[in-house]
Amino acid sequence: EVVVRFPVAADSALDGATLKGLQLNIEPGFTVLAIRRGGGYVYRPRGQVRLSAGDEVIASGPDEGQALLAAMCGWQLVEDDEGEDELVPVG
């Protein structure tokens, strides 16, 4: 299990979607712990919460699901020279 923080990019799969509609707990197996929005946090968000570009999703789930969640947020995980994951915009 890992905890990740990914910003929601404009026009990504998460931009404008509800948590319920995304079913992140099924694929890629992540539970959204909180959403950082406008300087504040929405803790333990419910399924009706709609995500928007600029939100930051804080979620826990399997290490192998990170790349898929990043892609759904509009990012690609790329390993840098030190072996750390770095977010690069898709497209």
Predicted segments with their positions:
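Interdomain regulatory linker/hinge segments that flank or connect interaction modules
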Residues: 1-3
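Cytosolic Rossmann-like ligand/nucleotide-binding regulatory domains
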Residues: 5-73, 80-81
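Short peripheral tails and domain-boundary helices/loops at the edges of structured domains
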Residues: 77-91
